[in-house]
Amino acid sequence: TYLALLAGVAVDAGLIRDVNEPVVARLPGIGFDSPHNAPITWQHLLQQTSEWEGSLFGVPDQVDRYRTVQYQPKAAQGRKGDPRPLQAPGSFWEYNDVRINQLSFALMHLFRRPLPEVFAEAITRPIGASDQWRWVGYDNAWVEVDGRRMQSVPGGTHWGGGVSIDSV
């Protein structure tokens, strides 16, 4: 995904020194401070095994628990959105858009810049891609980072927003 590419850019820039480092070590105060979330690493977020618990911009992670997608390792054991006991971070795979969006939120805080800017500078411009693409966030996903107001963008398009890019 675009977020995996940007995580690679962060590794290359030295912003992520070790994908096994807990996210909270560099980014306290953005949703990784609880006893359950504190052990979550960049690798867990990227591999969708974080089991991150919380709400992001008013959407709780529970809405995507037990979500079924074609390529998942095994069938969901409940109905989408039902409560499910959380496992230890890194021990359970589940596709969850809120958790993907939390990865995006964390990367934005790590770069201290809007991700569309970083994506253009590090990915699309260097490869000569068209600038006719958009990465749109949700209306309520505005935050202030270092005195600059910026929009956190989603990693997917499940609830609108996301990346629109031409393949030509």
Kindly label every feature range from the protein language model.
Residues 1-5, 21, 40-43, 97-101, ...:
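A structural signal for well-ordered alpha-helical segments within the folded catalytic domains
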Residues 6, 35, 56-58:
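Short, conserved acidic/polar surface loops in the N-terminal third of protein domains
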Residues 6-7, 119:
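Active-site-flanking alpha-helical
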